[in-house]
């Protein structure tokens, strides 16, 4: 697959198109001021000892990890970082606080002052980004300058479009800053996507203007706005400003205490030593030009001056809409006084529309979340009501079942004639009884009429096999006692029961005996032979 590269700016061969500075301008041109040491020490009373300089600090104190924070400046007690259980286990290995608390996974980036690593917290397993200063503290003033970045991170950490800062500490004359881990930088996003939709560019511009306005409202300037210093959050939508190492107050910046950022994004007035909020607007405008046109910005040369004089290459600028062209050109005007402020840009109709759209979507998302929560609550209550109602119903049915009267079953006696053709013959009652035996058999009701059809009552070949739970023991009495027993039972009961032999049908039932057939349920053990009497 062919790799796409960003197109360079066209070379200009005609001298009349070159924007050279005349000798008079060169005489008044100043070199960019270098970063000078500051006359104050911005040190927190809670963590640092103001009475000692870095050179006079003992070696043991520099090896101890001290927390850095400007949020509780009123505290005067110096404290060290608390030890976690994992840190306590690794403390015997003479590891730094960073190595004890974090597992280094990858290197995310590198700047002029430090390196950024992706780490995993050993205590909770969460992923973070930790920035470690490259150089050792060369003195108290240099240390105070590095700690100023911690103050700025803590100041803007709560803003939606600024990176979230967690904590900072110093150990072994180095500064460590723990921050949230974002998905990627805007530079990486551009290299991955190459062509970014214009609607997405408008959203990115809105995020960065909101973050930049939070700095300008405090009379601070960033001075290092570029695609590498813009990070995309975990939601893959929100863009956040990062790297506040060059952030400085506007009043102090013009007294030669400021340092310029990347020359590709630098405003032209920075070369003259004039620092203002408009410099951040220019840097943001040229960053949007790079993002929208996918072009490679020059770091110096005549093309660099072309962009600083408001001349944009037509072959690049024609690829975007006129509305976006107008905004970018207004942000890149050579005169800082003619550039719009962050607040004025946020009042642009397109950006106003996006803000209203975001607000409506935010309200809708909040409403949907609250609806889902309320729906879960209502459904939970309904389920509780259903469960309670079902329990009450079961209890009611159980009470009804217990209150139902129990009626004893009476035997059914049907008087039928013994022979349909005969007249005057006594009727024979049909008696319903149940066979009970020692062998467990499924409840089976037998009727006397089953044995009144002329068949042998002891012939069980046509009766079907009952469901026997256990086996029947074999007869070991040589068959004689069993035969006598059966004959006695048959003789005592008789094959027919006549009504006239008793005073009433009930007396006939009372005289009937229960037939025990448990001994011949499984198979016929022998054949009955009656002697002729």
Curated annotation (Swiss-Prot):
Its EC number is 2.7.11.1. Gene3D superfamilies: Phosphorylase Kinase, domain 1, Transferase(Phosphotransferase) domain 1. The modification Phosphoserine is found at residues 504, 519. GO terms for molecular function: ATP binding; metal ion binding; protein kinase activity; protein serine kinase activity; protein serine/threonine kinase activity; protein serine/threonine/tyrosine kinase activity. Residues 1-35 are annotated as: Disordered. GO terms for cellular component: cytoplasm; Golgi apparatus; Golgi membrane; nucleus. The keyword Transcription regulation does not apply. It is an enzyme of class 2 (transferase). It catalyses: L-seryl-[protein] + ATP = O-phospho-L-seryl-[protein] + ADP + H(+); L-threonyl-[protein] + ATP = O-phospho-L-threonyl-[protein] + ADP + H(+). The keyword Phosphoprotein applies. It is found in: Golgi apparatus membrane. It comes from the Eukaryota. The active site is at 224 (proton acceptor). ATP binds at residues 108-116, 131. PROSITE patterns: PROTEIN_KINASE_ATP, PROTEIN_KINASE_DOM, PROTEIN_KINASE_ST. GO terms for biological process: female meiotic nuclear division; G2/M transition of mitotic cell cycle; germarium-derived cystoblast division; male meiotic nuclear division; meiotic cell cycle; negative regulation of G2/M transition of mitotic cell cycle; negative regulation of G2/MI transition of meiotic cell cycle; negative regulation of mitotic cell cycle. It is a peripheral membrane protein. Mg(2+) binds at residues 229, 243. Keywords: ATP-binding, Cell cycle, Golgi apparatus, Kinase, Magnesium, Membrane, Metal-binding, Nucleotide-binding, Phosphoprotein, Serine/threonine-protein kinase, Transferase. Acts as a negative regulator of entry into mitosis (G2 to M transition) by phosphorylation of Cdk1 specifically when Cdk1 is complexed to cyclins. Mediates phosphorylation of Cdk1 predominantly on 'Thr-14'. Also involved in Golgi fragmentation. May be involved in phosphorylation of Cdk1 on 'Tyr-15' to a lesser degree, however tyrosine kinase activity is unclear and may be indirect. May be a downstream target of Notch signaling pathway during eye development. Belongs to the protein kinase superfamily. Ser/Thr protein kinase family. WEE1 subfamily. This is Membrane-associated tyrosine- and threonine-specific cdc2-inhibitory kinase. It comes from Drosophila melanogaster (Fruit fly). The gene is Myt1.
């Amino acid at each position: 697959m062919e790799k796409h590269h960003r197109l360079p700016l066209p070379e200009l061969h005609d001298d009349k198109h070159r924007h050279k500075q005349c000798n008079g301008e060169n005489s008044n041109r100043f070199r960019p001021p270098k970063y000078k040491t500051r006359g104050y020490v911005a040190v927190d009373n809670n963590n640092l000892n103001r009475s000692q300089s870095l050179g006079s600090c003992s070696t043991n104190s520099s090896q101890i990890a001290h927390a850095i924070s400007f949020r509780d400046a009123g505290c005067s007690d110096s404290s060290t970082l608390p030890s976690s259980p994992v840190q306590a286990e690794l403390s015997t290995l003479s590891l730094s606080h960073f190595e004890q608390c974090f597992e280094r996974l990858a290197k995310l980036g590198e700047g002029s002052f430090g390196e950024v690593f992706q780490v995993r917290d050993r205590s909770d397993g969460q992923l973070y980004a930790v920035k470690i200063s490259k150089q050792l503290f060369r003195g108290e003033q240099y240390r105070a300058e590095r700690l100023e970045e911690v103050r700025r991170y803590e100041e803007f950490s709560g803003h939606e479009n600024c990176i979230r800062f967690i904590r900072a500490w110093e150990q072994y004359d180095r500064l460590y800053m723990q921050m949230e881990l974002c998905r990627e930088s805007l530079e990486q996003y551009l290299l991955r996507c190459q062509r970014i939709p214009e609607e997405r560019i408008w959203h990115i511009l809105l995020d960065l203007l909101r973050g930049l306005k939070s700095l300008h409202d405090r009379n601070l300037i960033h001075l290092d706005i570029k695609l590498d210093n813009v990070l995309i959050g975990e939601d893959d939508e929100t863009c956040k400003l990062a790297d506040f190492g060059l952030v400085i107050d506007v009043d102090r910046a013009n007294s030669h205490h400021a340092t310029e950022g990347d020359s590709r994004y630098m405003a032209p007035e920075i070369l003259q030593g004039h620092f203002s909020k408009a410099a951040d607007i220019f840097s943001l405008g040229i960053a949007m030009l790079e993002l929208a046109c996918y072009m490679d910005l020059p770091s110096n040369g005549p093309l660099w001056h072309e962009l600083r004089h408001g001349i944009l290459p037509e072959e690049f600028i024609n690829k975007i809409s006129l509305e976006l062209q107008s905004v970018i050109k207004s942000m890149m005007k050579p005169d800082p006084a003619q550039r719009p402020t962050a607040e004025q840009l946020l009042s642009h109709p397109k950006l106003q529309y996006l803000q209203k759209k975001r607000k409506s979507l935010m309200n809708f998302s909040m409403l949907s979340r609250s609806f889902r929560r309320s729906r879960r609550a209502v459904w939970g209550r309904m389920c509780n009501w259903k469960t309670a109602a079902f329990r009450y119903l079961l209890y009611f049915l159980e009470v009804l079942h217990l209150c139902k009267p129990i009626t004893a079953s009476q035997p059914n006696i049907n008087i039928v004639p013994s022979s349909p053709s005969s007249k005057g013959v006594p009727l024979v009652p049909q008696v319903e009884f149940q066979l009970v035996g020692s062998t467990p058999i499924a409840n089976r009701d037998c009727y006397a009429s089953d044995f009144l059809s002329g068949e042998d009552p002891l012939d069980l070949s046509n009766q079907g096999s009952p469901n026997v739970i256990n086996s029947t023991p074999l007869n070991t009495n040589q068959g004689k006692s069993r035969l006598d027993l059966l004959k006695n039972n048959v003789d005592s009961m008789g094959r027919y029961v006549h009504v006239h032999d008793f005073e009433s049908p009930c007396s006939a039932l009372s005289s009937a005996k229960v037939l025990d057939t448990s001994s011949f349920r499984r198979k016929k053990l022998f054949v009955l032979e009656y002697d002729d009497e």
